[in-house]
Amino acid sequence: MGIPFPAVTSRAVALVLVSLVLCTELPASEIQKGEYLTRAADCIGCHTSNPSRPFAGGYRVPTPFGDVYSTNITPDPDTGIGRYSADEFVRAVQKGIRRDGADLYPAMPYDSFAAMSREDVLAIRAYLLAQPPISQPRPRNILPFPFNQRWTVALWKLANLRTGSFTPDRSRTAAWNRGAYLVEALGHCGACHTPRNATFGMDEDHKLAGGTAGIWHAFNITSDKIAGVGDWSNEELSRFLKTGAVPGKAYAGGPMAETVMNSLQHLSDDDIQAIVAYLRDVPAQPGDEKQPRFSWGNAPAADGDAGTEGMTQGSGTATGDDLYRSLCSTCHGATGGGSSDGSYPSLTRNSTAGAATPEDVVMTILEGVKAGDVAGRQSMAAFGGWLDDGQVAALANYVTARFGNPDVNVTAADVRQMRAGSTTSRTIMILAAQSLAAGAAVLMLGLLLLLARRLRRGTSSARLMFLHRDRR
């Protein structure tokens, strides 16, 4: 039957009105500035689920409490931001409040964007409003109780939301201040790289000491020489931010690879160097690591000289060595050395294989790596649909034992949880939060009952006094 004519007409009128407003209000220079800032903030990374429909939302953002789906930020008047005024847009970005007054879930890092300047926020708005409008409603979030209640967000904001724009430190250089603004506000690095506190806000006492991005581990990027990036040169840090690859140290995967692809590779050299200058000065936050992640693994050994060929997990009959030879050696080499040009990474002296936890190795096997749009990088295929949990565990254990940190081990049960988007620690955290919320609800109910009882007693006492006075 198609769309009813009145619906088509009203929608067409709305789109025409939006286009007329944009043409008269948005100068080209503001749009150009907004394009750069939108890339720096990596808006497309979370607000695009289908590359052919940029900024239309629907991207699944895994959180410790369930899945949140991103909103449509195209100028569509019905499902996007076409009807948002400038003030409403700023309020959404910096305070996490929708146009209708509802609180936005902090999967959007408005606790970082709160420090952005209003001018930068409005420049981003100008760029977004200049994009083609796309009608695409947002899927419903998948959150268990009590996290599906938006009043919990209001409580979260009371504990964690910062106020006030970034204030430059006049005792520092212009580059340092620019880097601080990019890291702390616009680039919202802490959203992934800072651990969370008891209320699940960013733990400012351990700023940039390492956190999570979904199941992936976001590494410590403080100046600590073992746990962080203190032993990296400025050139290595700049190269990693621009390409996601520093042979002999690290290759970005997961959300970090996508951030390089969508955002960091497009930043100016001055801004990259400013980020490096600021990271150099972030106080060191030590971890539990015995040695730097990239220091594990020797030079590639002779083919088959691994001593771990017998590792198996679960129902799979193939050993880790069998799986590596059949699935990995074509790109990474029989001895894990990668390609000579670095486009296929070496697995020795690699921060992923040398990490203290197995999540990134497992997730790399399950999801692959999207890096093909970055110069000098190649994407890696995902094997999650090919291998069962036991085979993934066997391959991951083979890689860490032969090329990385031999103290790391993962089981088929661990892989099953990661594949489902969870970990044991995350499950415990959710149960603890639910128990806390249930306890708070019981306490609130008890207080209400006590108050009601006292009110009844007060009413009864007043009634008795009235009767007594009446009899007299």
Where are these regions (language model features)?
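Post-cleavage N-terminal segment of exported redox proteins
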Residues: 1-30, 68-71, 92, 97-100, ...
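Sequence/structural segment immediately N-terminal to covalent heme-attachment motifs in c-type
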Residues: 29-49, 54-62, 157, 167-197, ...
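An acidic site on a long C-lobe helix of protein kinase domains
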Residues: 30, 42, 85, 116-120, ...
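C-type cytochrome heme c attachment motif
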Residues: 39-48, 71-72, 87-95, 106, ...
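A generic secondary-structure signal for well-formed alpha-helical elements
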Residues: 41-45, 50, 97, 128-135, ...
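Active-site substrate-binding loop specific to GH73 endo-beta-N-acetylglucosaminidase modules
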Residues: 56-61, 195-244
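Axial heme c-ligation environment in periplasmic c-type cytochrome domains
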Residues: 59, 67-83, 88, 94-119, ...
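Short, low-complexity patches enriched in S/T/P/G
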Residues: 424-434
